[in-house]
Amino acid sequence: MATIQFIQGINEEVVPDVRLTRSRDGSTGTATFRFTNPKILDASMADKGEITGMYLMDTEGQIITRDVNAKFINGKPQAIEAVHVIKSPDDWDRFMRFMERYAQDNGLTFTKASS
């Protein structure tokens, strides 16, 4: 099972919008995750701990990014945006294996951008 966590041990239930970019040679890229009204921002989660990063967990282990930001509207957190930088072809392959598992577990589909 593939899950996403912001505090280790607490799975995020909201499925994000994920946008991918990739360099022309395919060696590097970014994955931007946007969670609208994620569970981790609920008032009931305040005593669970601090958001220390985004943890992509699956059977192979975990992928970690610390580039996590909250988006506020009228002074209240409404979304979380996290960016994972992919630095090599091996990292890209590992990330895509995670996304295939996560997509299968959560009913996501891949739509290629038109160029």
UniProtKB/Swiss-Prot annotation:
Membrane topology term reads: Peripheral membrane protein
Name any Gene Ontology BP term. Answer: photosynthesis
Q: Which UniProt keywords apply?
A: Chloroplast, Membrane, Photosynthesis, Photosystem II, Plastid, Thylakoid
What's any one GO cellular component for it? Answer: photosystem II
Q: Name one Pfam family in it.
A: Psb28
- Fetch the NCBIfam families from UniProt: PS_II_psb28
What is this protein identified as? Photosystem II reaction center Psb28 protein
**Organism in which the protein naturally occurs:** Pyropia yezoensis
